[in-house]
A protein has these predicted regions:
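N-terminal periplasmic "start-of-domain" segments of outer-membrane beta-barrel proteins
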Residues: 13-67
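Extracytoplasmic beta-strand/coil segments of soluble accessory domains associated
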Residues: 36-49, 73-115
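N-terminal periplasmic accessory domains that precede
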Residues: 46, 72-75, 95-98, 127, ...
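Transmembrane beta-strand segments of Gram-negative outer membrane beta-barrel proteins
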Residues: 53, 105, 135-136, 155, ...
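Short acidic/polar hinge/loop motifs at secondary-structure boundaries
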Residues: 114-141
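Exposed, low-structure sequence patches enriched in small/polar residues
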Residues: 122, 282-307, 328-636
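Transmembrane beta-barrel wall of Gram-negative outer-membrane proteins
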Residues: 183-207, 213-247, 274-291
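Flexible loop and strand-edge segments within Gram-negative outer membrane beta-barrel domains
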Residues: 213, 233-285, 289, 304-331, ...
């Protein structure tokens, strides 16, 4: 897919608004000359840190304009190639990532630095979040991830809300279409309706039949944002995201299918089960940055959801389970506070905490989760004039039934003008989710990272290694009836295990506008849940003519054989597979994006050779597919 040459740091600049050029002139009356100009919003509002995080991967809304994407996981896959995609083969389902040998439950998602999670499952459906709602996205790993977030020894993703600062009405429309009757649209309207005030409204609608039986979805959401900036140093926002997200949960294909490529004859494990969530996420956030050395920000939030699991009688779990439609209601209310202080030219301190009340009802698939939890952290960063930087921190969380501790330290040091060394060591706990069983002990993760960087990020080489040791890992097995129907999972604490691996990526400009990269991931140990080798190569050429541009390129990747773990939809847990997943390549993809004025057309012809590949066992990736999307912004 499309390449991003380094983490971008783009945002709505002051030049985007007519307020930036309003200046009093000599013949202006005194009353007008002394009038207060409208304030600009704090550009770092909603970020984990109001100041620079050196080891943070970041991309912004201007970056994703160049990408052929349909959902948030499409963007993450193109911007963070060190993650292994745990894709379910289509759109709208629980597509996630394995980072440094972890799994989807080791990743944490935040919006404006407040947590987004489904309490029953202990994780979040990434593609539930509309990409058009983001301004910038931070991806943290290692020490920074486990200190600033919970259950995040894989990665911590924080999404900053979109910042629109326009005097005239701003409108952006997005439309997408693909095979298997995929149709999607998105709209955004925003305007400064009074000095220092902005209102934003958006919607998103998607539908998809799916390649295989019971793998489609039907999704829509609406969103609203209100911003008040009384000064250039202070910003308050109120946002609401309502989601209605329904999808077929077929559990992957049956292992004994003779042909995994024929959507007519390939039989799914579960033919009569679908899930739908109705969810509200309301966030009141504030940021205050009085000077270049101090910042305070926080948020109060509410999230409520109703999960519906609609099942045929063949998937009832026992004689007491007689309702076809099972509903589980969850809610959590909380507050987050973060303080940052520059102690000296070389020392920064960050501290904060959160307080949360959660209530998630019990069901045939999940334990009850109810009560108050609290967390606090401290993070210090030190940078010398020689370019050496140190970061360390600790986080403690007290839940209803356990205490979790996370801590770590990291160093970055230049070896020469073109070579830099990084190392990171962290220790963290992951609490079990209600669907795993709250009576289980927490997992304990030890993660060591080491890397070398040669040259700049846009045209250099990155090589890194990791080692992850997991004590009391939470493992799951499939529960079936006498007919082989999947009824759910049973989780338990397994034997300690370790996984080691590496990642290497090289980027270069072959010519002035011809950009190429190759990359590879490697994994060993840990029960062979991940392939020994996963790698690829891609290239793109960009042509510019005034304000218009054309980008075209290709990408191809492949994996070696591995056993892996497959996904069980009733509990969102992974179980060991019966068979080995064969080595495969992704069939090669070609893509192009064209910009003409404020309109942008994107097209991807993926899997040209209709190759069969499974990133999650028994969930084949899409075959030859044409994806087209068009966006058009007015008064941008």
């Amino acid at each position: 897919m499309l390449l991003v040459a380094g983490g971008a740091d783009l945002y709505s600049a002051a030049s985007d608004t007519l307020y930036a050029v309003q200046k009093p002139v000599a013949d202006t009356p005194d009353s007008a000359r002394n009038a207060k100009l409208p304030s600009l919003p704090v550009k770092s509002h909603g970020l984990i840190s109001q100041f620079t995080m050196p080891e943070c991967v970041m991309f912004g809304k201007r970056d994703i304009e160049k990408m052929p994407y349909f959902e948030l996981t499409d963007i993450l896959r193109q911007t963070f190639p060190a993650a292994f995609p745990q894709s379910l083969g289509g759109f709208g389902g629980f597509n996630s990532f394995s980072v440094f040998g972890g799994n989807a439950h080791d990743n944490s998602l935040r919006f404006n630095a407040r947590p987004l999670v489904s309490p029953m499952f202990g994780t979040f459906l990434l593609d539930q979040f509309p990409p058009e709602m983001l301004e910038r996205t931070e991806i943290l790993t290692g020490t920074d991830a486990v200190v600033f977030g919970d259950n995040s020894s894989g990665m911590l993703i924080n999404i900053q809300e979109a910042i629109h600062d326009v005097k005239k009405p701003y409108t952006r429309l997005w439309y997408a279409q693909s095979d298997y009757n995929f149709i999607a649209s998105d709209g955004v309207f925003s305007q400064n309706f009074a000095p220092d005030w902005n209102g934003t409204f958006g919607f998103r609608r998607q539908s998809y039949d799916g390649r295989f039986n019971n793998s489609g979805f039907d999704i829509w959401n609406v969103r609203f944002g209100l911003r008040f900036s009384p000064s250039d140093k202070t910003t308050f926002t109120l946002t609401e995201l309502f989601t209605n997200h329904g999808f077929g949960a077929n559990g992957g294909l049956m292992p004994d299918n003779t042909d995994f490529t024929n959507p007519i004859t390939a039989l799914p494990r579960i033919s009569d089960l679908d899930e739908r969530v109705f969810r509200h996420d309301i966030t009141l956030a504030g940021s205050w940055r009085p000077d270049s050395g101090f910042a305070a920000n926080g948020s109060a939030y509410f999230s409520g959801e109703n999960w519906e699991i609609n099942r045929g009688s063949a998937y009832f779990t026992g004689v007491a389970d007689t309702l076809r439609l099972m509903q589980t209601r969850s809610a959590f209310v909380g507050a987050v506070l973060r303080l940052e202080q520059k102690i000296s030219d070389i020392l920064f301190l960050r501290a904060g905490g959160d307080l949360t009340w959660v209530n998630s009802a019990a069901s045939v698939y999940a334990d009850v989760l109810s009560g108050v939890s609290a967390a606090g952290y401290i993070h210090a960063s030190w940078a010398s004039s020689a370019g050496i930087s140190l970061r360390s921190g600790a986080r403690i969380r007290i839940d209803q039934d356990r205490t979790s501790l996370s801590l770590g330290a990291a160093v970055a040091a230049p070896i020469s003008s073109q070579i830099a060394f990084t190392a990171d060591f962290s220790r963290s706990d992951r609490a079990p989710s209600p669907t795993e069983g709250r009576n289980l002990p927490s997992e304990k993760h030890l993660l060591a990272l080491a890397g070398l960087r040669f040259g700049p990020d846009s045209s250099g080489i990155i090589a890194s290694m990791f080692s992850r040791y997991i004590s009391s890992p939470i493992e799951s097995i499939r529960i079936t009836d006498t007919n082989g129907n999947t009824l759910g999972t049973h989780s338990f604490s397994g034997d300690s295990r370790a996984v080691v691996g590496g990642f290497i990526r090289g980027r270069t400009f072959l010519f002035k506008r011809l950009f190429a990269q190759c990359w590879a991931q490697s994994y060993f140990g840990g029960g062979a849940e991940l392939p020994a080798l996963f790698g690829g190569i891609s290239a793109q050429y960009e042509y510019k003519a005034g304000a218009s541009s054309l980008i075209a390129g290709f990408s191809v990747s492949g994996i070696t054989a591995y056993r892996g773990e497959t996904f069980v939809p009733q509990t969102w847990n992974y179980v060991a597979t019966e068979n080995e997943t064969p080595a495969a390549f992704d069939g090669c993809s070609v893509f192009a994006t064209a910009k003409l004025g404020n309109a942008r057309l994107r097209a991807v012809y993926s899997n040209l050779f209709s190759a069969h590949i499974e990133y999650t066992p028994y969930y084949p990736d899409l075959d030859r597919t044409l994806r087209i999307s068009l966006s058009w912004a007015f008064n941008d």
